[in-house]
Swiss-Prot record:
GO terms for molecular function: protein phosphatase activator activity. It is found in: Nucleus. One of its GO terms (biological process) is DNA damage response. InterPro entries: ARM-like, ARM-type_fold, EVH1_PP4R3, P4R3-like_central_dom, PH-like_dom_sf, PP4R3-like. This is Serine/threonine-protein phosphatase 4 regulatory subunit 3. Core regulatory subunit of the histone H2A phosphatase complex, which dephosphorylates H2AS128ph (gamma-H2A) that has been displaced from sites of DNA lesions in the double-stranded DNA break repair process. Dephosphorylation is necessary for efficient recovery from the DNA damage checkpoint. It comes from the Eukaryota. GO terms for cellular component: nucleoplasm; protein phosphatase 4 complex. SUPFAM superfamilies: ARM repeat (SSF48371), PH domain-like (SSF50729).
Length: 749
């Protein structure tokens, strides 16, 4: 706000300057608890300057002046803005206050713009002439019952900034800072004080003095002060904290914690050991980007390590958003062709014989690319996809091939696998673009390019089967799960990447049984065709190696790694439930995999593996597939299942519960058939379950009868006897699964 040209000298010799335009207003005063209208006029903000005789210094005094609208000579109000008067702006057009004489005064403006003008004038006076006055906005709450006060301007209590801080001054500073977080105005004024008056430097100086003198109470107070400053959620304060000069000191202050007053963390030592490991493999020409990389690391260290127990949701989000702004800038820089940064990294893996590129440098390159992937995790989906496609197009998979085929360092191979997992979890269809010159989800129908390259699956299979690192095995397993999950392949924005494999299989079962099923429209037909081609290649090129221990009868499963067998059973379960039966079933049955699978239910193996085998077996049964059921019954593959049941018949454990759950599910299906009164010669669905019940009750009835503590085993036996009588009356001795099928199954009892 600037002084207008309207200036004159009053009768007492004071110079009067006008700071606002005239605004029409009504003046009210409170008398006997009622507001009295004292007239309508024009209000202005004025400043009078007088010379004090004793000191010959100029003194400025600010006034709210209202003159009558009909006569400029008649003053309706002249009120000085002084001392600790609080002005309240109520709603849009009202300013209310109590002067030093105790008189309540209100100005009601004709337009809100007039009220705005006078509020700006009050702010000007508070900043430049009378710092003790204040202006507060008062607004009604949404429910109309209460009111909300917000400071617009006013005196701000600030911490002492003297060089030598005492325990008392630090305690007072902490109190003031906590109070100043209550209102935006106080918060903003405090932020300006911290930045402009270099308050952080004062705290750091006090920290060194206190640590040297072992003033532990001061150190704890300093830690709480810095934490409170972080809660101001100011980019300026945070960036000052993480600059080269202050970061180590700030972390040192935060090593002290009032929750653990008798101990101290060692953030500074960690940083001294860690920060020298920052390597600039490829020179970064932009100093701003170099600074952002450092700032991003330091903010992440504060957020995830130093302040992990302290940050509230708002501050956590604020720091995360600030990091995201850095990360976006860094990712944008990496994608700029002009700086050639990624090209220089990828080129180290294109010529293996290049003696100028050392193995350590190639390892550092993989670490760098892994950091790039990690850096992109918080980007939105579209930006992340564009960045991943950029990396793939530049040759990311050449780096991964090197890591899997040439690198022997386990840590580096784990990082490479983590890169693959990150790509898969974001968008599995990116993997299908590896062999295409253009990074697209799928090749054109008329393209000669093979979109079903299995090299990545073969690499992951090799790692899963042969690598000695448990971490690498687990990552390879998760990558295979994602690559073999048809839901990931078909659904664009698949949201269940964090689901474990058992949850995925349950979802598939629901879809198979008609639940949770949205269907696929015609636009996805091409994707389904590509999926079928992809899976056929998998069963032809990869599955024989992946399930070699199940296919080769000479392999003693008991000598295999049982944790690996659990993973293979889960993958098998995924394939059986999720892949087209016409593709997966042939591979599984022709290679006798189910025979080896069910042998894992025996007592020779750990319980977790036995239960995984039983669950897989159960899921096969409830596919209600004619071919599988014929095979299972014909080969008597239920024997190991009921052997486990017999062993745990009277036990309250997972083995018993798992098999009881299988029997209960079968009984539920039988009840549905019975309630619908479907004859044995009815639908395939009904006949399959009735025949399965006949087989189970006939072969394992003695075990079922001993499980008399549950009702459904008795119900299964009752249905079995009833159906046996019906068959006897019909003189039927053999049953076909299909009236038009020449294959007849002798049900063994």
């Amino acid at each position: 706000m600037s002084e207008s040209n309207n200036m004159h000298v009053s009768g007492d010799g004071a110079k009067q300057s006008v700071y606002t335009e005239k605004k029409r207003v009504k003046v009210y005063v409170l008398e006997n608890n009622e507001w009295k209208d004292t007239g309508t006029g024009f209000c202005q903000g004025t400043v009078e300057e007088r010379t004090i005789d004793d000191t010959q210094t100029a003194e400025k005094m600010a006034y709210l002046l209202v003159v009558d609208e009909d006569s400029d000579d008649q003053v309706l109000l002249k009120s000085r803005l002084e001392q600790n008067i609080e002005y309240q702006r109520q709603e849009e057009t009202l300013i209310v206050w109590k002067d030093l004489n105790g008189q309540d005064i209100a100005l009601s403006f004709e337009e809100s713009i007039g009220c705005d003008s006078l509020c700006e004038y009050i702010c000007f006076v508070q900043k430049n002439i009378e710092s003790r006055i204040s202006l507060v906005a008062v607004r009604s709450t949404d429910d109309g019952i209460g009111s909300v006060h917000e400071i617009i301007t006013g005196p701000v209590n600030l911490p002492s900034n003297v060089p030598n801080q005492t325990e008392e001054s630090l305690l007072e500073a902490l109190k003031i800072l906590n109070e100043n977080t209550s209102f935006d105005y106080l918060r903003n004024e405090t932020i300006q004080f911290v930045i402009n008056d270099h308050y952080l430097a004062t705290l750091i100086r006090s920290f060194y003095q206190s640590e040297e003198s072992k003033l532990y109470r001061n150190l704890l107070l300093l830690s709480n002060i810095v934490k409170t400053l972080i809660l101001f959620n100011s980019k300026e304060i945070l960036e000052e904290m993480i600059n080269d000069e202050n970061f180590l000191c700030v972390c040192g202050i935060l090593e002290y914690d009032t929750e653990f007053p008798n101990s101290k963390l060692n953030h500074r030592q960690y940083l001294k050991d860690k920060e020298p490991n920052f390597k600039e493999m490829i020179p970064i020409s932009d100093p701003t980007i170099k600074l952002m990389i450092t700032q991003n690391f330091r903010l992440q260290f504060l957020k995830d390590v130093v302040l992990v127990r302290f940050l509230d949701d708002q501050s956590f989000t604020f720091i995360s958003d600030l990091m995201l702004s850095y990360q976006n800038s860094i990712i944008d820089f990496l994608q700029e062709d002009s700086n050639n940064f990624i090209n220089q990294v990828i080129s180290m893996y294109k010529v293996e014989e290049d003696s100028t590129v050392t193995p350590d440098k190639r390892r550092d390159g993989i670490k760098l690319l892994h950091e790039c992937i990690q850096l992109s995790q918080n980007l939105n989906s579209i930006e992340k996809t564009l960045f991943y496609k950029f990396l793939i197009k530049k040759g990311l998979f050449q780096v991964i091939q090197f890591a899997f085929n040439m690198e022997t360092n386990n840590d580096i191979r784990i990082l490479a696998t983590d890169i693959v997992v990150g790509l898969i979890e974001h968008d599995i269809q990116l993997i299908q673009s590896v062999q295409s010159d253009e990074v697209t989800l799928l090749n054109d129908e008329n393209s000669d390019i093979d979109s079903t390259d299995m090299s990545l699956l073969l690499i992951l299979t090799k790692i899963l089967l042969t690598d000695k690192s448990p971490g690498l095995k687990e990552q390879s397993f998760q990558a295979l799960v994602s690559l073999l999950d048809p839901e990931d392949y078909i659904v664009d924005d698949y949201q269940n990447h964090d689901d474990n494999i058992d949850t995925r299989i349950d979802n598939m079962l629901q879809i198979q049984n008609g639940k949770n099923h949205d269907g696929l429209d015609g636009e996805r037909n091409h994707e389904k065709f590509q999926l079928a081609e992809y899976l056929q290649c998998f069963y032809r090129q990869v599955a024989p190696s992946l399930f070699h221990c199940f296919i080769d009868g000479s392999v003693n499963l008991y000598e295999c790694d049982q944790q690996l067998l659990i993973k293979l059973v889960k993958l098998l379960n995924l394939m059986i439930q999720g892949h087209e039966a016409s593709i997966s079933r042939r591979f599984i049955l022709e290679n006798g995999i189910l025979i080896r699978l069910i042998s894992l239910a025996s007592s020779d193996y750990i319980l977790q593996l036995r239960l995984a085998a039983v669950r897989c077996f159960k899921n096969i049964v409830f596919l209600n597939d004619d071919f599988y059921l014929r095979y299972l019954i014909g080969k008597n593959l239920f024997d190991p299942i009921f052997e486990v049941f017999k062993e745990n018949l009277n036990e309250d454990n997972m083995a018993n519960s798992t098999i009881l759950d299988f029997l209960k599910s079968l009984n539920t299906q039988l009840k549905v058939v019975e309630q619908e009164d479907i004859p044995l010669s009815g639908s395939k669905s009904s006949r399959n379950f009735m025949l399965l019940n006949k087989y189970i009750c006939g072969r394992y009835g003695d075990i079922l009868l001993k499980a008399d503590y549950v009702s459904f085993t008795r119900e299964m036996m009752a249905i079995y006897h009833e159906e046996t009588q019906k068959l006897a009356s019909l003189s039927t001795t053999e049953t076909s699964f299909d009236e038009n099928d020449n294959t007849t199954l002798e049900v063994e009892v």
